[in-house]
A protein has these predicted regions:
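AAA+ P-loop NTPase catalytic core and its hallmark functional loops
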Residues: 2-157
Length: 157
């Protein structure tokens, strides 16, 4: 499946702050209305654990077929592996999906010195006690969030 984009101002649009605007964007992209309804049902079902943070999307993702395939996979309980050249919108899509589903989004950029504790969590001292400090993968799982594992090819084997 190829990523498809519009070239309007390099795919960038001004900051958006409401999920409603994202759903309007999906309608303009002519995403199958039943898929948009399924997103809404999901959001209602998990409204009590929804991400209510005020962070805004910087960009919108364009690409009807990719949107539909990604949402369908997520609704079926699958994980996504987005692979492709640099600057093709993989992170933008992941952030848009997290916002559409109203889930928290955690971004973890891999590097050569990364170890398991920086991803999952580690012990630390707090108030004279050893306590577990969760990493982004652990926290994402606890919160039912989206975890973007960026530049995974840069990690040590």
């Amino acid at each position: 499946m190829k990523l498809q984009y519009r070239t309007e101002s390099a795919l960038l649009i001004p900051l958006l702050t409401e999920v409603k605007k994202l759903l309007e964007h999906l309608k303009k992209e002519q995403i199958n209305p039943s898929i948009i309804e399924e997103i809404k049902k999901y959001r209602q079902k998990y409204a009590d654990t929804a991400d209510t943070s005020q962070t805004s999307l910087r960009y919108l993702y364009y690409g009807k077929e990719i949107w539909e395939a990604a949402v369908h996979a997520l609704l079926c309980g699958e994980n996504l592996l987005l692979a492709g050249s640099k600057a093709t919108g993989k992170n933008v899509l992941a952030e848009n999906l997290a916002r559409a589903f109203r889930r928290p989004c955690y971004n973890l950029s891999f590097h050569i010195n990364m170890d398991a504790s920086s991803m999952i969590g580690n012990d630390t001292f707090r108030n004279g006690e050893v306590v577990f400090r969760p990493g982004p993968i652990y926290q994402s799982a606890v919160d039912g969030g989206f975890c973007i594992l960026d530049e995974i090819n840069m990690a040590r084997n």
